[in-house]
Each structure stands twice: as C-alpha cells, then as structure tokens.
C-alpha cells in the first residue's frame, strides 16, 4: 500500500512541475547575434568559395598545359579533385534544400 501512495505523490509532483514549466514557456527565438551572417549570406559565400576553387583548378591546369615552370602534375590533380569534391558537396546541399522545400510544401495545413 505504501508504494501506491508514493506513486500518487510522485505523479502529483510531476504534474505540478509540468504545470509550472508550461506557465514559464516562452516562444523559441534565438537572440540575433551582432554580425552573424544570415543563411542566404552563408550559402552565397559557400557557392563563391566553390567557384573560386574551380577557377583556381582551371587556371592551374591551363598553366600546366602551356608548360609554365613551377606547376606540377600532382598539384594540378589535387586542385582538380578539390574542385570536384567541393562541387559534389554543393550539389548534395542543393538536393537536400530542394527536398526539404518539397517536404514542407507537401505538409497538410
């Protein structure tokens, strides 16, 4: 019988704590940090960085093709692979954004 009373007391305490927590509820909104970039700015910076990587890879490949000194084939291949990986990552991010948009648009209202 003692366990039944203990259980009821515990449940009453939990309910009172729940009601207290619900009374203190505030809307979820993170404070805006000064100088923090927005999502669109971050995405734009990422696209610009991928573009710079691809342009650097192309410039290095062109320099190797014309026989410019100081440009090694291994450096050209590494730059090419960096550009390829960064472009593939950007493509995957785009795909995830499109999928998230489609999921949100298909949600019932």
From Swiss-Prot:
- The reply on keyword ATP-binding is no
The GO cellular component terms are: bacterial-type flagellum basal body
Q: List the disulfide bonds.
A: none
Task: Give a Pfam family name.
Answer: FliE
Can you name one GO molecular function term for this protein? Answer: structural molecule activity
Q: Which UniProt keywords apply?
A: Bacterial flagellum
| GO BP terms | bacterial-type flagellum-dependent cell motility
Judging by the UniProt lineage, the source's domain of life is Bacteria
Subcellular location per the Swiss-Prot or TrEMBL entry: Bacterial flagellum basal body
Family, according to the entry, reads as follows: Belongs to the FliE family.
**The protein, known as:** Flagellar hook-basal body complex protein FliE
The organism named in the record is Pseudomonas aeruginosa (strain UCBPP-PA14)
């Amino acid at each position: 019988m003692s366990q039944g009373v203990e259980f009821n007391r515990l449940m009453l305490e939990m309910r009172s704590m729940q009601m207290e927590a619900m009374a203190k509820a505030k809307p979820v909104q993170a404070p805006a940090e000064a100088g923090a970039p927005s999502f669109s700015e971050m995405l734009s910076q990422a696209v610009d960085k991928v573009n710079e990587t691809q342009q650097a890879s192309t410039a290095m490949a062109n320099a190797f093709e014309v026989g410019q000194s100081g440009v090694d084939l291994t450096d050209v291949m590494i730059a090419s692979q960096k550009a390829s990986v960064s472009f593939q990552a950007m493509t995957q991010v785009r795909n995830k954004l499109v999928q998230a948009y489609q999921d949100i648009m298909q949600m019932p209202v």
